Swiss-Prot record:
Protein name per UniProt: Homer protein homolog 3
Coiled-coil stretches noted in the UniProt entry, renumbered to this chain: 94-122, 191-353
Keyword set includes Coiled coil: yes
Ranges of compositional bias, category Basic and acidic residues: 258-268, 278-288
Naturally occurring in which organism (per UniProt): Mus musculus
Location of region: Disordered: 136-169, 244-295
Length: 356
């Protein structure tokens, strides 16, 4: 077997239909999904075929003859009649471009089949030097590779493809009676089914992503609100610190005044002890000393409180800076989430508009 017979000249995907053999009016789909439809060159028999396989079954096995005509019945649907198979095939494509490519390749193969028949009738050897078909997968093989006794058999086989006048009229009537509107609807229906399944999957994924992003957005908003409250508390604490500093200054001044008073008393006592005057007032001196001790204790306590407040103030300032940084990061993340949510909404809107 020739390798050219096993390799397609051109391949595409389409929804395959056959005319109802009973009514000759309705189309019967070959399946729910698009199938691969290919042009093949059979070098052994020197013929071109259109073949489509569904599972283990050949859905289309049509030999292209010069008498065949491929008819576009809509922007995405085309059909041709095969008199040898006694049926009409229909193909529904996903786009008009694919239909045009298939129709152009049909004309090329049809012309190549005509030239092959003419050469075989003349008894000459024919090669495909000037008539090589453009292949999407492999280079085409020669149109005719046999000579001699096999030509008579080839001539008889291809001549049998030519329909008689009665058969031609019957095929014309079959095509005219075919429901073009139903054909278009069938092809569009299967194409739209595939498209809708893809869109539905994309919408489900987008909705799931949107729900997740909304949840993350709510969490970020809650964290941002907590950080704002923490910053407000720290600012309130910082506002109280200057008042405590003023209280310390007043206490320090009182301590200084009392220390000066104690020094004055000590000097007076010293003067009295060196003179011949009366003994000092012991009760007043003890009272003054007790006041000095109390003031010194109070001063030490205030200094300890001041150091503690200064440490707290530094910690509060550092905490406030950290909180501000956290608020800034949260605000940036919130902006990013809002932007992503906006893009998601636009994408969903485009998908909804594109959906039929």
């Amino acid at each position: 077997m020739s390798t050219a017979r096993e390799q397609p000249i051109f391949s595409t995907r389409a929804h395959v239909f056959q005319i109802d053999p009973t009514t000759k009016r309705n189309w019967i789909p070959a399946g729910k999904h698009a199938l691969t439809v290919s042009y093949f060159y059979d070098a052994t028999r020197n013929v071109y075929r259109i073949i489509s396989i569904g599972g283990a079954k050949a859905i289309i096995n049509s030999t292209v003859t010069p008498n065949m005509t491929f008819t576009k019945t809509s922007q995405k649907f085309g059909q041709w009649a095969d008199s040898r198979a006694n049926t009409v095939y229909g193909l529904g494509f996903a786009s008009e471009q694919q239909l045009t490519q298939f129709a152009e390749k049909f004309q090329e193969v049809k012309e190549a089949a005509r030239l092959a028949r003419e050469k075989s009738q003349d008894g000459g050897e024919f090669t495909s030097t000037g008539l090589a078909l453009a292949s999407h997968q492999v280079p085409p093989s020669p149109l005719v590779s046999t000579n001699g006794p096999g030509e008579e058999k080839l001539f008889r086989s291809q001549s049998a493809d030519t329909p008689g006048p009665t058969e031609r009229e019957r095929l014309k009537k079959m095509l005219s009676e075919g429901s073009v509107g139903e054909v278009q609807w069938e092809a569009e229906f299967f194409a739209l089914q595939d498209s809708n399944q893809r869109l539905a999957g994309a919408l489900r994924e987008a909705n799931a992503a949107a729900t997740q992003w909304r949840q993350q957005l709510e969490v970020q908003r809650a964290e941002a609100e907590l950080l704002r409250q923490r910053v407000a508390e720290l600012e309130a604490q910082v506002a109280v610190e200057p008042v405590r500093a003023g209280e310390k200054e007043a206490t320090s001044q009182s301590v200084e005044q009392l220390e000066a008073r104690v020094q004055t008393k000590d000097q007076t006592l010293k003067n009295q002890s060196t003179g011949t005057r009366e003994a000092p007032d012991t009760a007043e001196r003890e009272e003054t000393q007790q006041q000095v001790q109390d003031l010194e204790t109070r001063n030490a306590e205030l200094e300890q409180q001041l150091r503690s407040m200064e440490c707290n103030l530094e910690e509060a300032r550092a905490e406030r800076e950290r909180a501000r940084a956290e608020v800034g990061r949260a605000a940036q993340l919130l902006d990013v989430r809002l932007f992503e949510l906006s893009e998601l909404r636009e994408g969903l809107a485009r998908l909804a508009e594109a959906a039929p």
